[in-house]
């Protein structure tokens, strides 16, 4: 697994050796150089892959073991997932891996020997993200050669007893119970981290405020950095990053590179059309900054331009030497500072201030005082030193705030049935190296668990995969044009159709070698479901480039349909219900509501405004935030009528809030929800001003791309 680690990824051995008393031998750099020199040789890649199968230095298992016919489901293809898959394949097991992200097929024949690896490599600035590798793909910056991910894929995909399914997530397209029913002998959780932590301060949801996960996933996995990309992500300078871990450093360096690319691309393609006053101000700002970058003749002048514009600054609540970034990999901190990123210590965020457009304009910080551990005997060595907010505050001007303050592990453990690796295992939480270690140290536990059991599936792996291909692969069944801007999209995806409950939705994407034809992740709610035929019907409205591209899909074309995701709608009984939607009825929802003895009325907007509906029990609203807000204010419903809205916020991963883009401010103690997992909400708690503002986060870019 040296292709996944090495220089600037793994430095545990160097740090553990002499604790910085002198310059250590840089073992990871040596390992990376050996791999690099090997790959330069004719058939060097084949030599490396051979050594991953035949390892003469491993005296206990120099060769892969004989086939066991055990079928193991690995859920996730991040560092833990691809490492565990490798060790399980060496143990002789059949490995089927699933990943909720889209994974683009490799552009070359994986079974044909590669003579010169450099002919297959891409420049990192031009490389289209392929989705394989999880956080290794979207969470690590250009400090690491991501072409290595293609090597890791080859190591796995050249095994006849390995198959992966992308756009398939556990608990969505397939459940744990279904996996066991399909004759999997074991399920291994390698699903990575959970939801990002959010600052509990005012205006945390303002325009210009993002989570680090959102920023990195949109940039690296969505390909926002690529020329002509359909992925929109707007950032402005100065940039404030709140946090102190390695992720905050990655965000800081990437934000500088991306900002330059963003404004240069904008200046080249700018057309003034349908712009608001805010759009015009931002456009002038971007064009002026693009000119400054164009005038910079070298890196030193470029660094001066960044400093003039405010640059990127990391703000940490404690001292630099106590920050996770310094403790885990101080070398990365040195590299980051050398690029011109600033690091401010002892800064505790108190409040985010916004301008007249609802966009962040400044952050108020409290300058904290550090309490020396010698004066606090109860201080624990693994805890961050205590910091106490002071009365000293400072106001920092900024136009982008990125929160990199950690993530929550929401995994519910059942060690009797399943095993857990990487970030979803508290023992190995926190880095790529730990994730790989968890697989190396944990695969034998699976082997011991299986040894006394008989394989559940009696046939060959080819037969096993045939049933999975049918159940898990999503293909276009038919496209019916309804009018110029509306069409019906019917997709064949049997297990997804079976698992769907009304109120949930799906994430649709396509595969294309042409980046201009790639569909951004689109959230679609089914209009109807045919479980027997495995068909899911969607009514799609052309409201942007990605939804327009959906119409160009071909029959039998393979697509990514991840889901069903989100929370299902609670189906009541014996109630009077009104569904307010478009003129195209949600046939499936109407049917199931009527089956539960409800009286259902379908209404459109603005026709609904003409009626007095005081006797209605429930109103289900599937419209824009503007219409939903107006309906709430109208006095046409009774006092006890419950108004339920489907919160259509910005979304990206749609995997229970992992990226954090879908954060939505709500009223009450909870303060916010992740709309992709809790999208059906009572209208009373929704902050519509916040929702409408966040939906305009990338407004200017969207107008340009459309």
Curated annotation (Swiss-Prot):
One Gene Ontology term of the molecular function aspect: oxidoreductase activity
Transmembrane segments: none
Coiled-coil zones: none
Domain of life (superkingdom): Bacteria
NCBIfam families (UniProt xref): PRK06567.1
The protein, known as: Uncharacterized protein RP006
Organism annotation: Rickettsia prowazekii (strain Madrid E)
Organism taxonomic ancestry: Bacteria, Pseudomonadati, Pseudomonadota, Alphaproteobacteria, Rickettsiales
